[in-house]
A protein has these predicted regions:
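Conserved N-terminal helical subregion
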Residues: 2-8, 52-188, 230-247, 380, ...
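Conserved N-terminal glycine-rich FAD pyrophosphate-binding loop of Rossmann-like flavoproteins
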Residues: 38-58
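Active-site substrate-recognition segment that forms the wall
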Residues: 199-232, 247-250, 272
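Glycine-rich "substrate-gating" loop/helix at the edge of Rossmann-like oxidoreductase active sites
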Residues: 40, 100-105, 301-304
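C-terminal helical "tail/cap" subdomain of flavin- and related membrane-associated enzymes
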Residues: 1-6, 68, 259, 300-301, ...
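Short glycine/proline-enriched coil/turn segments at helix->beta-strand junctions
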Residues: 24, 28-29, 120-124, 218
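A short coil-to-beta-strand element that immediately follows conserved catalytic motifs
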Residues: 177-179, 197-200, 243, 255-270
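Conserved mid-domain beta->alpha element of the FAD-binding
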Residues: 9-38, 157-158, 183, 213, ...
């Protein structure tokens, strides 16, 4: 058994953990990142980064590197499930950047993870460290890992995802299945001759299902969401799917949707989970970040972006109020973040049902509401973390 002393231990080497490490470094706060996987890999094909997320990455000096491997969508388009009509459209591209002060990017998760890891460097990243125990000591927190090693830290940040082990030290809240599931895929553009506006972010909305897609370079990333199964019986996050299962759910939809689904092998089915609101995000010297604190449904494309916000605000609060006795910093962090992330969670949950309406008066009313989308949800995209550490203390 080995033991090392670190100032701040970040549990989880995903987008949130690495971003936090980089943000702490900018403030001169030493941290070490502990990741359970033996090597860094990202689950999921791609991620949409809105202005509230790209603003954080720009401040970390990663803007040019990430822009080179990202795709900027031309529009946000909502379409009818069967005839493909453009029901509502909003500009993105330069208009979005000028409106919100930072760009919108579609990017491979692997490219984002790689850029963060390279910026962080290998010296502060410890792989193969599966957290098994959290023990409070008089001089800090002792973390025990599955390989038998231990680490004593002055402060611990749980950035270890929706099934967070660190969260058990704060509360016993567990994720809740939404009653919906998703299928992911990456399709070459040239395999989709029927697809209109391939450079746009597009939602195809229909009875009991929807399909979202956007371009990542020469491929189209899609997420198809269906209702059911009623109960999630698989212990892992995915369930096996039979060949053609997804296509059967979208029978009768527009040819572009069918082309997209049939262009790739049948993927596993992902259960879509959310995390009920936590009464607190911290206890003692332990605090949560990202999905560990507020896992949400993907229908606003805000999971990664809210995690980036968390990382920036937490680093700012620790720098402003001190990491030696973190209670004050944690309190400011929670006040800055809990209400906002809860609002995004609620809105994402409601959006799930709205995207699945059958044709009729309710769908018509939804389409009219979508025309005001930019005004209704500007509060998400225009967020600037730099005002938060000070604002919550005012």
């Amino acid at each position: 058994m080995t033991r090392n002393d670190v100032g701040i231990a970040v549990v989880g080497g995903g987008i949130g953990g690495l971003t936090l490490g980089l943000a702490l470094r900018r403030h001169g706060l030493p941290a070490q990142v502990f990741e359970r996987a033996p090597e860094l890999t990202e689950v999921g094909a791609a991620v949409a980064l809105a202005a509230n997320g790209t603003r954080v990455l720009r401040e970390l000096g990663l803007s040019d590197q990430l822009a080179a491997v990202s795709t900027v969508p031309s529009e946000l388009v909502y379409r009818h499930w069967s005839d493909g009509r453009r029901l509502v459209a909003h500009p993105v591209g330069d208009w979005y950047r000028d409106r919100f002060g930072a760009p919108f990017w579609g990017i491979h998760r692997a490219h984002l993870q790689r850029a963060l890891a390279e910026a962080w460097g290998g010296a502060g990243l410890h792989l193969g460290k599966e957290l098994t125990e959290v023990r409070e000591r008089a001089d800090g927190i002792e973390l025990g890992f599955a390989d038998g090693s231990t680490v004593r830290a002055g402060l611990v940040v749980g950035a270890d995802g929706v099934n967070s082990r660190a969260r058990r030290s704060i509360c016993d809240t567990t994720p809740v299945y939404s009653g919906t599931s998703g299928f992911r895929g990456l399709v070459p553009r040239d395999a989709l001759p029927s697809l209109p506006d391939p450079d746009a972010v597009q939602f195809w909305m229909g009875p009991g299902a929807h399909l979202l897609h956007y371009a990542i370079g020469d491929v189209i990333n899609f997420l198809a969401v269906i209702e059911g199964p009623a109960e999630w019986r698989w212990p892992a996050g995915t369930a096996p799917a039979e060949p053609g299962e997804l296509a059967a759910h979208f029978a009768g939809w527009h040819p572009a949707v069918i082309e997209m689904i049939r262009a790739v092998p049948q993927s596993p089915c992902w259960g879509l989970y959310t995390l009920p609101p936590l009464r607190r995000w911290s206890r003692g010297r332990i605090v949560l970040l990202g999905d560990a604190a507020h896992a949400m449904l993907p229908h606003h494309g805000q999971g990664a972006n809210q995690t980036l916000e968390d990382a920036a605000v937490l680093a700012d609060c620790l720098a402003e109020y001190g990491s030696g006795e973190p209670a004050v910093a944690f309190a400011h962090y929670e006040r800055a973040r809990r209400a906002r992330t809860r609002q995004v969670q609620r809105s994402s949950w409601v959006t799930s049902a709205l995207l699945h309406l059958p044709d009729g008066p309710a769908a018509t009313a939804r389409n009219n509401d979508l025309k005001q989308l930019v005004n209704r949800f500007s509060w998400i995209h225009e967020y600037d973390h730099r005002s938060q550490a000070h604002a919550v203390g005012a």
